[in-house]
Amino acid sequence: MADTKAKLTLNGDTAVELDVLKGTLGQDVIDIRTLGSKGVFTFDPGFTSTASCESKITFIDGDEGILLHRGFPIDQLATDSNYLEVCYILLNGEKPTQEQYDEFKTTVTRHTMIHEQITRLFHAFRRDSHPMAVMCGITGALAAFYHDSLDVNNPRHREIAAFRLLSKMPTMAAMCYKYSIGQPFVYPRNDLSYAGNFLNMMFSTPCEPYEVNPILERAMDRILILHADHEQNASTSTVRTAGSSGANPFACIAAGIASLWGPAHGGANEAALKMLEEISSVKHIPEFVRRAKDKNDSFRLMGFGHRVYKNYDPRATVMRETCHEVLKELGTKDDLLEVAMELENIALNDPYFIEKKLYPNVDFYSGIILKAMGIPSSMFTVIFAMARTVGWIAHWSEMHSDGMKIARPRQLYTGYEKRDFKSDIKR
């Protein structure tokens, strides 16, 4: 029982006493579960003031620019760890020992192959299909091939499904790209890192093997780390909602991919790149900045600011550093990259952007990095999904471990009252 109480008075009647729950960090939460028995519900479109669950995985303080995974700051994880170690931490709650890490890495590495019949499913899609459409379909179809791990009430089944998803997602993502450009699939190699293996499957061809550049490999690894989890966002909430019905893990992750595909969620870095293409040249920047400052103009600078972070996005600091490392390594000369760098300079120095805290966010820099690496914008959200899979799995697993009720939101009904029906159609 909570020590602190909140009182809600309805129409001047006796106050309803509600528990106030306190977490380890963050805002207090009023427990409203008893309100339904009083004949009222709360109204919170978008759930911006609603804690939909209890979780121990990720903490965000948007005002202070803090992001913690299992208590570890994201900047420390991005600079001092690697993606697979972060995966272990998200899934298990603690840092791995060397032995635990080696075993985890080996298990992931040995399950990167996908069933050969799955490769034939790609041919059921048009080659000009958006890669996210293909990812939704292929991921959901995994349940038809790996039905020996679909019992969500069995902890061992959940663990097997988690490893399969984490292991096979880079393979499927790279195959989406290869299929879209008409090149043969490249199979995974067990001698490469998680990020290096993905890059090899993306860019290697039978006639020209791909040599993994360590700078680009590390950059990709950081992109994966920085997108691994972000608390109860739209796609994670979608995974939890789907999972609350007892749906199998592959279906739940496919649902998360579908939610992530939305331009307001996972498509932000692709949208930022399209904005740079619209600006097209450094000489056009002043005009677009003027438009961005005009509240009556529909133009918005994409890749700046964040719904949660009212301070600098803690992921953006590491991503900015990585971005400059990649551009220096590649010596890339590109008009859009020049536009991006000038926009960054303006945003970090212009009083308007500073006052409104419209700093470049992680999507702004990740889009630049991926473009410089030769990855098309249509693949940006696929890579986001690949990175976020571990976060989705962690939340899905936590939900099942803690016990859950099927999600069933209520509504504020504003339609017709009851009325009689008499058809005007001749039958």
From Swiss-Prot:
Give the EC number: 2.3.3.16
The species is: Escherichia coli (strain K12)
Entry similarity comment? Belongs to the citrate synthase family.
- What name is this protein filed under? Citrate synthase
Give the miscellaneous note: Citrate synthase is found in nearly all cells capable of oxidative metabolism.
How is the activity of this chain controlled? Allosterically inhibited by NADH.
Alphabetically list the UniProt keywords: Acetylation, Allosteric enzyme, Transferase, Tricarboxylic acid cycle
User: Does the keyword Acetylation feature in the UniProt annotation?
Assistant: yes
